[in-house]
Swiss-Prot record:
Sites of Asymmetric dimethylarginine modification: 892, 898, 908, 914
Record cross-link Glycyl lysine isopeptide (Lys-Gly) (interchain with G-Cter in SUMO1), residues: 600
Localization of this protein: Nucleus
Region (Disordered): 1-35, 64-121, 205-304, 316-430, 500-663, 691-720, 759-843, 872-931
Cellular component per GO, a single term: nucleus
Polar residues bias (residue ranges): 341-356
Sequence motif Nuclear localization signal, residues: 621-638
Residues in RRM domain copies: 428-506
The name this protein goes by in its record: Scaffold attachment factor B1
CDD domains reported for this sequence: RRM_SAFB1_SAFB2
């Protein structure tokens, strides 16, 4: 605040002293206990230069008091008892003996020497402690401004309001205007001057708006009702044309915003330095332009502050309200030369009203608002015609002429000192991040004092976030010491935490303007120079002419402003005073239908426009990505690339898996086909084997059938051979009996024949008779036959009644049947089931020979028997001598001859007994035969 008041002209020094004595109590303090702001106030009261550091100011004030004959150790100064002191140090109260602050959030530790920075730099330092730097530039420009505390916001406008009240009282203004100033102060206290919000509480607005409007209407005698004016900062872009004291809270807020941006973004501080340098140049030109202003300019300052607050609220597009009409009249520099001059300005305007109404339509942004605003302006000016005028204009011009040179010298000295300090402090500051919550500024001072002289050490945090991280801002005496501290203490441990020491890229108290604003600054310089020249010329003219020029100039400026940056349709055209930098605006409230007149200074609009420009610049700066955001974006890109790689890898794996599954399916299909082929082949082989087995079985059956057929053929052949042999044998056996005709002889009686038949059949019915026959028993037969021959003669008579023994059959005994039985013919053997077993072919001949032998033996046996019987029957009636005859011998020979045939099997033709028998018969005499 000291810096904002450092440019006050010497013309306002006496009034400032009067205001301070009237508004607050006076106390006695030692010179060494005075603050820089108190020292400068005392110097300004004595019309001395108030620039420089504290030691220079103390020396200068001490000399002045000694020249006046006072005691330098006991100085009567204003003790502002009703002023609310902030909890944190403001810009002008950075005490040298205060090492650690009470709030615990920020601290300031010096090296025992008073800070040599100006009050503006103190303001920036205070703002810097109100913010929190979250990893360099992590906070955007809009949120950084939230670090300002409400106590400080309320303190500065309140103190400035007291100063305005004192100045009004020193000029003897009416009581109504003093009350209005008090109300204005209360309204300002209710304004939230945070550089990010600039919001006004609605209840405070309504409470302060109504009384102020009524008082202004009473003073001015108007029928117009004051309403809040909402204007774009772009419409209000005009250079400074007012006293240095009129910079007030608007300048402070703008600088606070610059400081917030520089603390949040250290790399942007150089641009802000250029901007501040440009403002200083404009301020100097404004001092020249206000050289002819009145001594009561402090009243205009009060009005401009309240208007500037309203403008700042409008810039943020919040529903901020301010006493527009009343402040417009109060802020009119023409009417502030004397208490009654304020209302007389409106009475001087009717002459120029017609010119304003003619020129004003060309500056309107659109046809419809232009017509309505013309009507409103005409109505407002006509309603203000009855206000009386006051003749107090020359005093302000004289006072301004006397103090113009001192203001120029003061501004030059101030600018040079700032430039020198800006150059000397370049590269000395650095940030310390990663601090513990228990780290204090004294700890930082003790730590960095090992490597050089520590000019200042501060611990900052976000006051609105209780748990925010702490950062340190340290200023060394030289850039080399700062570099040494960075090299030695970067990445070291302090209070158990790793700290990072990084050099500040630009100084927070810089004065440079960004390159993109150089063109605007040059234009503002040119326009300010033109207005300064116009002011000097117009001060020599008449007041009415001055009023006309004011109206003309304001109309032209309104045209330029509307052409460059047109506002909304509800904005009214503005008329600017080139001589005093004022602007009169008439608007129509569409909701109430009441015209509103507002007079504003161009300086406040210039500050508002600069604030708007700063906001636009800050919005542009918000687009600048901080290191953390870059790191975060890089991490996000890395994570995205990792996810992309993971997705590609998963897709590739899925493709490989699908390909593997497809190949596996193909392999399985091929294997299934191969198995099916093998199965078909095995099936075919099995069927082939079955077919071959069937064929083999068929061939076997054929072979078996063939063997059976061959066997049957062999059997048939054998049977045929047997039949043939049998047929060949039968005629030879039957021939003797057929030749013999004795059957028909009467020798054989029928009865006897039958009996013999019976005996024969019964005797030979036994099948095993042949087998029981023993050839060794043949010896019995001769005896038997002899016996029979012996008894035959005696028994001849009884022969008819006798029967032959069973073993001697009759002639029929030797029949066919008997032969069959004795010979075991083939028919009999087959019928009895006693056939010979099948013999192999190789045994057939031997069997046939054996069979022939058996048959030959049987034949001989039969032949012998028959011959013996025949001899018995034939020689039964002869004598015994007959037995010894040839017949007996033949019989014996026949019997012996039976076993004398060759083994090869002689036929019956070779049997000798037959011939013997025939020879026997042939040797018989005919007589004996007949007998």
């Amino acid at each position: 605040m000291a810096e904002t008041l450092s440019g006050l002209g010497d013309s306002g020094a006496a009034s400032a002293a009067a205001v301070s004595s009237a508004a607050s109590e006076t106390g006695t303090r030692r010179l060494s206990d005075l603050r820089v702001i108190d020292l400068r106030a005392e110097l300004r009261k004595r019309n001395l230069t108030s620039s420089g550091n504290k030691s220079v100011l103390m020396e200068r004030l001490k000399k002045a008091i000694e020249e006046e004959g006072g005691n330098p150790d006991e100085i009567e100064v204003i003790s502002e008892g009703n002023k609310k002191m902030p909890k944190r140090p403001s810009k002008g109260k950075k005490p040298e003996d205060e090492g650690v602050e009470d709030n615990g959030l920020e601290e300031n530790s010096g090296d025992g020497q008073e800070d040599v920075e100006t009050s503006l730099e103190n303001l920036q330092d205070m703002d810097m402690m109100d913010i929190s730097v979250l990893d360099e530039a992590d906070i955007d420009n809009g949120s950084v401004a939230d670090c300002v505390e409400e106590e400080e916001e309320a303190t500065l406008p309140e103190g400035l309001g007291l100063l305005r009240i004192g100045r009004l009282q020193s000029k003897g203004l009416p009581e109504q205007l003093q009350e209005l100033a008090i109300d204005d102060k209360e309204a300002i206290n209710n304004v939230d001057t945070s550089s990010s919000d600039f919001t006004i509480l609605q209840e405070m607005e309504e409470a302060s708006l109504e009384p102020e409007n009524e008082k202004i209407l009473d003073i001015l005698g108007e029928t117009c009702k004051s309403e809040p004016v909402k204007e774009e900062g772009s419409e209000l872009e005009q250079p400074f044309a007012q006293a240095t004291s009129s910079v007030g809270p608007d300048r402070k807020l703008a600088e606070e915003e610059d400081l917030f941006e520089s603390c949040g973004h250290p790399e942007e501080e150089e641009e802000e330095e250029e901007e501040e340098e440009q403002e200083e140049e404009q301020e100097e030109e404004g001092d020249l332009a206000l050289a002819s202003s009145s001594k009561s300019e402090s009243s205009s300052t009060r009005c401009q502050w309240s208007e500037a607050d309203a403008l700042l609220a409008v810039v943020k597009r919040e529903p901020a309200e301010a006493p527009g009409g009343g402040t417009g009249m109060d802020r009119e520099p023409v009417g502030l030369e004397e208490p009654v001059e304020q209302s007389s300005t409106a009475a001087q305007l009717p002459e120029t009203t017609s010119q304003e109404l003619v020129r004003a339509p060309t500056a309107a942004p659109s046809p419809e608002p232009r017509d309505s605003k013309d009507d409103v302006k005409k109505f407002a000016f006509d309603a203000c015609n009855d206000v009386p005028a006051a003749p107090k204009e020359s005093s302000a011009s004289e006072g301004a002429d006397q103090k113009m040179s001192s203001v120029e010298d003061d501004s030059d000295t101030k600018r040079l000192s700032r430039e020198e300090k800006g150059r000397s402090s370049c590269g000395r500051n650095f940030w310390v991040s990663g601090l513990s919550s228990t780290t204090r500024a004294t700890d930082l001072k003790n730590l960095f004092s090992r490597y050089g002289k520590v000019v200042g050490a501060k611990v900052v945090t976000n006051a609105r976030s209780p748990g925010a991280r702490c950062y340190g801002f340290v200023t060394m005496s030289t850039a080399e010491e700062a570099t040494k501290c960075i090299n030695h203490l970067h990445k070291t441990e302090l209070h158990g935490k790793m700290i990072s020491v990084e050099k500040a890229k630009s100084e927070p108290a810089g004065k440079r303007v960004p390159d993109r604003r150089d063109g605007d600054s040059k234009k503002e310089k040119t326009s300010t120079s033109d207005r300064s020249a116009n002011l000097k010329r117009e001060e020599k003219g008449d007041r009415k002419d001055d009023a006309k020029k004011t109206d003309d100039g304001s109309t032209e400026k309104s045209k330029d402003a509307d052409d460059q940056k047109p506002g909304p349709s509800e904005r009214s055209r503005t008329t600017k005073s080139g001589s005093r930098g004022t602007e009169r605006t008439v608007v129509m409230d569409k909701s109430k239908g009441v015209p509103v007149i507002s007079v504003k200074t161009s300086g406040s609009k210039e500050r508002a426009s600069k604030s708007q420009d700063r906001k636009s610049v800050s919005r542009e700066k918000r687009s600048v990505v901080s290191f953390d955001k870059v790191k975060e974006s890089r991490k996000s890109r890395d994570s995205e690339s990792r996810r992309e790689r993971e997705r590609e890898r998963s897709e590739r794996e899925q493709r490989l898996q699908a390909q593997w599954e497809r190949e596996e399916r193909e392999r399985l299909e091929i294997a299934r086909e191969r198995l099916a082929f093998h199965r078909h082949r095995l099936e075919r082989e099995r069927m082939e084997r079955e077919r071959l087995e069937r064929e083999r079985m068929h061939v076997e059956q054929e072979r078996r059938r063939e063997q059976e057929r061959i066997h049957r053929e062999r059997e048939e052949l054998r049977r045929q051979q047997e039949l043939r042999y049998e047929q060949e044998r039968r005629p030879a056996v039957r021939r003797p009996y057929e030749v013999d005709g004795r059957r028909d002889d009467a020798y054989w009686p029928e009865a006897k024949r039958a009996a013999l038949d019976d005996r024969y059949h019964s005797d030979f019915s036994r099948q095993d008779r042949f087998h029981d026959f023993d050839h060794r028993d043949r010896g019995r037969y001769p005896n038997h036959s002899v016996d029979r021959r012996e008894g035959s003669r005696s028994m001849m008579g009884d022969r008819e009644g006798q029967h032959y023994p069973e073993r001697h059959g009759g002639p029929e005994r030797h029949g066919r049947d008997s032969r069959d039985g004795w010979g075991y013919g083939s028919n009999k053997r087959l019928s009895e089931g006693r056939g010979l077993p099948l013999l192999p072919r190789r045994d057939w001949g031997e069997h046939a020979r054996r069979l022939e032998d058996d048959r030959a033996w049987q034949g001989t046996a039969d032949g012998g028997m028959m011959e013996r019987d025949q001899q018995r029957w034939q020689g039964g009636e002869r004598s015994m001598s007959g037995h010894s005859g040839p017949g007996h011998m033949m019989n014996r020979g026949g019997m012996s001859g039976r076993g004398s045939f060759a083994p090869g099997g002689a036929s019956r033709r070779h049997v000798i007994p037959r011939g013997g028998m025939q020879a026997g018969f042939g040797g018989t005499e005919p007589g004996q035969q007949t007998q």
